[in-house]
Amino acid sequence: MEPAFKIPDTGVFVSEYNKKIFSATRMPETVKILDTTLRDGEQTPNVALSSEDKVKIAQALDEMGVDIIEAGFPINSEGEADAVKRVAGSGLKSEICALCRASPADIDAALRCDVDSIHVFLATSKVHLEKKLKISQDEARDKAVTAVQYGKDHGLTVEFSCEDGTRTGLDFLNVVHKAIEEVGVDRIDIPDTVGVMTPTAMTQFVAEIRRNVKVPLADHCHDDFGMSVANSLAGVLGGAEEVHCTVNGLGERAGNAALEEVVMGLQAFYNIKTNINTRKMAFVSRLVSQLTGIAVQPNKAIVGENAFSHESGIHVHGVLSDGSTYEPMRPEIVGKERTFVVGKHSGVHAVQNKLKEYGLELSHDQMKEVVARVKKWAESGKKLDDAELLAVGYDVIGQEEAPAIKLEEFTVFTGLNFTPTATVVLNIDGENRRASETGVGPIDASVSAIKAAVSKNIVLKEYRLEAITGGSNALCEVTVKLGDCEDAQLLSLGKSVGSDIVTTSVDAMVEGLNRLWARKLDVCSEKEKKRAY
């Protein structure tokens, strides 16, 4: 029997049956991506992006390789028009598009923004025509033709959408599509506006339209039934050559098709190329999350925190042997890193690997004791982070590195219209070192001063702050993860609890530095030890 899975060298590990099923299907070699994070994505409830935010996201999308960026809806407001104009004037390689209703006034607003193209929409389903627009099908057709012709007469690339297209009769869709094609429409989009298609139906629906039009087709799918990505891919099988999507699946109601899932689905399942640099996906996802204030769910496909995280002992053992055992792709392909989480389901391999990451090696019996403590801790409902695991490890072996670095003095100054400045004196193996640095805030200044006193080779890889109690005098917990520029394998953790965020951060840094210092000395030769830092 032919195996269902072969280990490829592409870094993507999917079933061979996909290729067998779709080998006879005619599909495009490449698909364009229209990203509408700045328009449909911004319509996510409680999201409002400034012009500066839109430019930042547009630049990131451009660098990632997005073909078309739908920058906004200029007629909506002066601020929106300003944002679209600023994106259009940013010198990006991507085609910059503006959304317009089938109205000359909307198109004029887009023209004032100097965009490359417009995406014109007009609802065509019976419910929209009768209940919302209160116009006939003939009037809708004529409005569509007039809008497309107006855009073309003004030198714009025009993409047209029959809003609520998947609930519009195919006969009427064909009438509208034929009419706008005759006046020069460049692309036709098929929107599943309220996410009501199944993938099989979407493929056939797009294929029917494909038979009646000559211009390129796009699809635009919403996630009301959780089918947006599947329907987007299904539309490509039916003949679409462009997909509308948003970063992290942002959008109205349940959201839109997620760009990262669409792109990886096209590549992994159908070997269809896009211009997207997939290694930038995780960065762009984080940027969009930060600027919109919408957190990415931990179990989100491709870019979620847990997408390449493993806790189960069986899974960890498998992944340590070969990543393809429990991962469908290499994490670095999408800009992620594999992580092992220690918890209730962990086995020796996971705990051993995590402790080894921070330079702590234990005997088999000691490791079993650590695992037993970890499981007991987890079963009581507590989450064990890396710093706490490290503390358990040191407790089991009965040693903790003697601190070579001691904080002797620390001062920080900050205030309104005053550049935050920090000064530290660190005693390192009996020698006092003083350093002063500025920063964007008191914590940044303090971290910079500590690094200057010890070594510029220190890298603050992670900083995590959590409030333990409530109120203005709440206790806080700071955890830092430090690395070394000269040796990527050297990592350490520091953790501290206190009522002052700045001093607690400094204490965590000093603890982390002591552990990093000890690890550095362990791998240095005798000659190098005195100049380790």
Report residues per predicted region:
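Non-catalytic terminal/interface segments that mediate subunit docking, oligomerization
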Residues: 20-24, 30, 43-44, 48, ...
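Mixed-charge, glycine-accented linear interaction segment located at domain edges/termini
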Residues: 488-493, 497-526, 530
